[in-house]
Amino acid sequence: MSLVYLFQSVGILTPCGSAGAIAYITSQVLPAILIGPADVALAQWKYIYSMGKKSFPFLAIANALVQGYLSYSERKRSIFSSKLYAISALSGLCIIPFTLLFMKKDINSLQTLNPDLILKDVKATQNFRSIIHRWGFKNLFRSAFMFFSGLASIAGSIYF
């Protein structure tokens, strides 16, 4: 029984923490880096993106594994809880295909931008800022997926 409690804790903290971190990047970090010159902002965005790419997909997968265990272990006691954990797993995993389907174009555009060009050309600077704002808006959807995953996990933990 104690293993279930441990997995419930991890199953709540992982998606909720990820949701908060993703939302923080969009609402606090992006505006802060956009204060400076565009070439510096681009370098900072690339660093932030590379760090997120190394962690958030794996957190989503780890969350899905934890939720999958909970869904499996709770199926005999409470089918509703089991379904909530399954919903939580799928919701958390949605950040990966969402990124690949809806954000990849913006990511590729930002990664291939020439820092020297965005410093010299006003139109290139405006284009950079437009792309990064669009990326930030889409990033909030990723936060929402993880938040919903956390809520489903909380509901599954409370329901039984």
UniProtKB/Swiss-Prot annotation:
InterPro entries per the UniProt record, alphabetical: Anthrone_oxy
TM stretches of this protein: 13-35, 55-72, 83-103, 140-160
Entry keywords, A to Z: Membrane, Mitochondrion, Transmembrane, Transmembrane helix
Membrane topology: Multi-pass membrane protein
KW Transmembrane helix (keyword) present: yes
Subcellular location: Mitochondrion membrane
Cellular component per GO, a single term: mitochondrion
PANTHER family: ANTHRONE OXYGENASE ENCC, DUF1772-DOMAIN-CONTAINING PROTEIN
This protein's name: Uncharacterized mitochondrial membrane protein C800.14c
Provenance organism: Schizosaccharomyces pombe (strain 972 / ATCC 24843) (Fission yeast)
